[in-house]
Amino acid sequence: LELSSAASDVYKRQPPNILLTTPESLALLMSYPEAPSIFSSLKRIIVDEIHAITESKRGDQLFLAISNIRKYCLDAKIIGLSATVNDPSLIAGWLAPTNDCDIILSDPGLVPEISILTTSEPPPWAGAGGLYSIPEIITEIETHKTTLIFHNTRAQAEIFFHNLWLANSKNLPIAIHHGSLDKEQRNHVETAMVRGELRAVVCTGSLDLGIDWGSVDLVIQIGAPRQVKRLIQRIGRANHRHNGASKALIVPANRLEVLECFMALDAIYENKLDSELQTQIPLDVICQHLLLVACAGPFMPLDIFNEIRTIEKYKNFNREDFDQCLDFCISGGYALKKYNQWHRLIQTSNGAVKLRDPRIANRLRMNAGTIQDSDTLKVRYKSKRGKSKGSTIGEVEEAFAVSLTPGDTFLIGGRIVKFESLRERVVEVSPLSLRHISA
């Protein structure tokens, strides 16, 4: 849910029948005074890919928000969905702390076909690119309808795609997809996939979840998987239909990863998955939650404390820690007491807590969230004469951008570009050659 201010106002007055949203956006909706009217008619809360949410602070933010809005819709049912849960009873505790939760284990379907790719050249002793396997991967692409080639990092994906393109003597339509690319380019690749126009896509975690392209019949994982669950999710992108067995190949990036890849295969066939839950209570998320609740209006601390303790993970959350979080929001805590700008909340004579200055509500909302992104800069083609600006390619980390000098080259979006200048937090580049690497 990313709406303009005007559209958001309309939404708050007329909530939709079905809302697809994120933990961050749900927390923002909770922070508005209109929250009671928005959620009073709520009947179902569905948390898809719940295993991915419960592994991080995003899960804490989501269930803190749910604990707050449930008072507006006491009869609402919560449903969690996942194909890779190690301990369903633990996840059920997040959904229904009172143990009133039905666990439905569906038939996992056909056993996936997974193997280590056999290559004529052995993997190197060091390195993490998997470039040695490109001849065999080209053959696999030629013999399958559509192949997804997963990498663990964006940099590895860029290097692999470039070398794959150079080896693509038959000019098969291939593309690259990752989170640092411009949204227009990602949409272009996704549209081409829907139309069945691509034979292969080199990608990262941007295509891990929620991708149901019927043409995909092979998944290749380059490098040892960091999680068994993540590998299963990626494998599930192939033959994603009720009666289809997923097919996947794993390519160790180097010889040290061979053992890890075989261990991952054993874990899959023995149905041994990674654990889901982080047991430590993130006090920073509690503080953020208190600030967002205050944006919606005054609250009684005991009420919010009791709401929080309805979450399974927080059932033993003690009042002392809660009060310290509240004190931090009111006075800045022991470290920031002398700085008035950190005195966000105030407690009234009747014990209620509210914003010290209602004008800071929007600022608090804008800074809400638990995703820690590194500072990035836009990468744009240098403007041509008569044009105000060139087209945007994607983003790079600021630390990388400031290390460049004019004339340096790098890969982004499958293109080799030459660094020209850094202006107004925009990296200006020019194409290195007339050859354009794209879908």
What does each of the following model-derived ranges do?
Residues 14-30, 195-209:
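Conserved two-lobed SF2 helicase motor
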Residues 77-94, 99-153, 254-255:
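Conserved interdomain linker/interface between the two RecA-like ATPase lobes of SF2 helicase motors
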Residues 181-203:
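Conserved helicase ATPase core of P-loop NTP-dependent helicases/translocases
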Residues 1-7, 11, 434-439:
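Single conserved hydrophobic/aromatic residue that forms the stacking wall/gate
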Residues 24-27, 34-72:
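SF2 helicase catalytic motif II
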Residues 209-223:
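A short beta-strand element within the Helicase C-terminal
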Residues 227-275:
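Conserved segment of the helicase C-terminal RecA-like domain
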Residues 273-405, 409-412, 416-417, 421-422:
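C-terminal accessory/connector segments of nucleic-acid motor ATPases
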